[in-house]
């Protein structure tokens, strides 16, 4: 290898190492800070806002209103757990059984990819990472998930998730969603309304709360049944998530 190639290789390696250190400090600081402080915006919100501006849509505003868990209806937390991650109180950030099932499904159905992301993984991804599918992003997501599972309580993870989840075009967080679709604060959401919001996850740009399709209504009904089977509100109290 020539001296010039060695120099370039050495430069690239040093740059990547420094970048990794900077990102580790940035993400580690974010995990520590947001363990107690409200989250003002997420990476997904920034991505959506920048994309809108680049497409000339200057009326788009990614909007979120932070609320604490005691300002969120317990039905809402239960609904997203029933819909997205029923083992949330028990696992350490990853649902291994669901991952194995998803991998087996995806091998058989290449055109219908099934995910197995837990609420913890979705929180890490939405808060810190870009959208899309790649092994690099998945690796970073895994590391960040371990970080928030180590530093945050399950209640904190659920609180952040509910405050940054996307529920529609420019609608981020359960408070903004409750006000937009039901004209009430998140604390007043009913069981049925919470299930409807959860029914559009994790694809709220395709499925609409304001104009629910037959699929969304069917999923809402399924979520309501799962909420009942989990035990209703006592489930949240039992696992100290309310």
Curated annotation (Swiss-Prot):
What SUPFAM superfamilies does the database record attribute to this sequence? Answer: Lysozyme-like (SSF53955)
Q: Which reaction(s) does the protein catalyse, per the Swiss-Prot or TrEMBL entry?
A: [GlcNAc-(1->4)-Mur2Ac(oyl-L-Ala-gamma-D-Glu-L-Lys-D-Ala-D-Ala)](n)-di-trans,octa-cis-undecaprenyl diphosphate + beta-D-GlcNAc-(1->4)-Mur2Ac(oyl-L-Ala-gamma-D-Glu-L-Lys-D-Ala-D-Ala)-di-trans,octa-cis-undecaprenyl diphosphate = [GlcNAc-(1->4)-Mur2Ac(oyl-L-Ala-gamma-D-Glu-L-Lys-D-Ala-D-Ala)](n+1)-di-trans,octa-cis-undecaprenyl diphosphate + di-trans,octa-cis-undecaprenyl diphosphate + H(+)
Q: What is its EC number?
A: 2.4.99.28
Please describe what this protein does. Answer: Peptidoglycan polymerase that catalyzes glycan chain elongation from lipid-linked precursors.
- Its top-level enzyme class, in one word, is transferase
Q: Which GO terms describe its biological process?
A: cell wall organization; peptidoglycan biosynthetic process; regulation of cell shape
The UniProt similarity line reads: Belongs to the glycosyltransferase 51 family.
Q: Where in the cell is it found?
A: Cell inner membrane
A single MF term (Gene Ontology):
pentosyltransferase activity
Q: Which NCBIfam families match?
A: mono_pep_trsgly
Q: Where are the transmembrane segments?
A: 19-39
PANTHER family tied to this protein: BIOSYNTHETIC PEPTIDOGLYCAN TRANSGLYCOSYLASE, MONOFUNCTIONAL BIOSYNTHETIC PEPTIDOGLYCAN TRANSGLYCOSYLASE
Q: What is the topology of this protein in the membrane according to its UniProt annotation?
A: Single-pass membrane protein
Which InterPro entries would you find in this protein's record? Glyco_trans_51 (IPR001264), Lysozyme-like_dom_sf (IPR023346), PBP_transglycosylase (IPR036950), Pep_trsgly (IPR011812)
User: What is this protein's record name?
Assistant: Biosynthetic peptidoglycan transglycosylase
Q: What is its main location?
A: membrane
Annotated metabolic or biological route of this protein: Cell wall biogenesis; peptidoglycan biosynthesis
| Keywords noted in UniProt | Cell inner membrane, Cell membrane, Cell shape, Cell wall biogenesis/degradation, Glycosyltransferase, Membrane, Peptidoglycan synthesis, Transferase, Transmembrane, Transmembrane helix
Q: Which gene encodes it?
A: mtgA
Please give the organism.
Answer: Escherichia coli O127:H6 (strain E2348/69 / EPEC)
Look up the record and report any one GO term of the cellular component aspect: plasma membrane
């Amino acid at each position: 290898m020539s001296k010039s190639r060695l120099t370039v290789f050495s430069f690239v390696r040093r740059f990547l190492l420094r970048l990794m250190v900077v990102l580790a400090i940035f993400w580690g600081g974010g995990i520590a800070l947001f363990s107690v402080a409200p989250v003002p915006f997420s990476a997904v919100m920034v991505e959506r806002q920048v994309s809108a501006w680049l497409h000339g849509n200057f009326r788009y505003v990614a909007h979120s209103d932070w609320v604490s868990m005691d300002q969120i209806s317990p039905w809402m937390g239960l609904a997203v757990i029933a819909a997205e991650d029923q083992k949330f109180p028990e696992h350490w950030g990853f649902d291994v059984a669901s991952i194995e099932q998803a991998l087996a499904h995806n091998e058989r159905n290449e055109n219908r990819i099934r995910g197995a992301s837990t609420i913890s993984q979705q929180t890490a991804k939405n808060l810190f990472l870009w959208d899309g599918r790649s092994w690099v992003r998945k690796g970073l997501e895994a590391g960040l998930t371990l970080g928030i599972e180590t530093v945050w309580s399950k209640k904190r993870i659920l609180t952040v998730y509910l405050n940054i989840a996307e529920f529609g075009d420019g609608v981020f967080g359960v408070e903004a969603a409750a006000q937009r679709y039901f004209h009430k604060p998140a604390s007043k959401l009913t069981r049925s309304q919470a299930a409807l919001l959860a029914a559009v996850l994790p694809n709220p740009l395709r499925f609409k709360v304001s104009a629910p399709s037959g699929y969304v209504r069917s999923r809402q009904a399924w979520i309501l049944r799962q909420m009942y089977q989990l035990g209703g509100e006592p489930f949240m109290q039992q696992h100290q998530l309310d």
